[in-house]
Amino acid sequence: MRFWLALVLFVGGLTAGSIGVVNQVENTPIDTIIASQQLDQPTTYVMIPNKLLTAYSASPQITVRGGEIFIATARQSDLVSWLEGSPYVELRLSIDIARETAELAEVLVSGNGNLVAPEGSDLWITEVAGRSRVSLDIEPDNQTAILLASNGLELAPRSISIERDISDKPA
């Protein structure tokens, strides 16, 4: 009888332990949020607005892939004025809570303005240029927005990724 009691308790302990491990694994908090997009809209300029940059408390890292790449940070009002009249794509954050995914959505802003090279404008707080792959860590404030382009005449880079490491942020 003692043997059967010990066996039942042992199997019950194993079952409770496995349920606890599975529950812990399923409910582990997310430490990284990655929103990426292959652009569908053909455009020369892409704007990442301040609202997207400040959606979470962690500082985002922007990674852009494709040909010639130019990334600039500026006050959003300055960036919108610089783009005024030119067609561009504004990125928005689309979150699917059920699937636990974050994607970038494109909003096309039409215009007939002139296309100009963005390099060297006095409106830019920071600017980075490169080829194939460029990354930029952003410290967002309540005004910063980002411009992505190539040389101002060619299409903007097509692959954009915004990554945030939230593992060390308090809940």
Predicted features by range, described:
Residues 164-168:
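Beta-strand elements of well-folded, non-transmembrane domains
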Residues 28-163:
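Extracytoplasmic/periplasmic regions of membrane proteins
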Residues 1-29, 169-171:
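Hydrophobic secretory-pathway targeting helix
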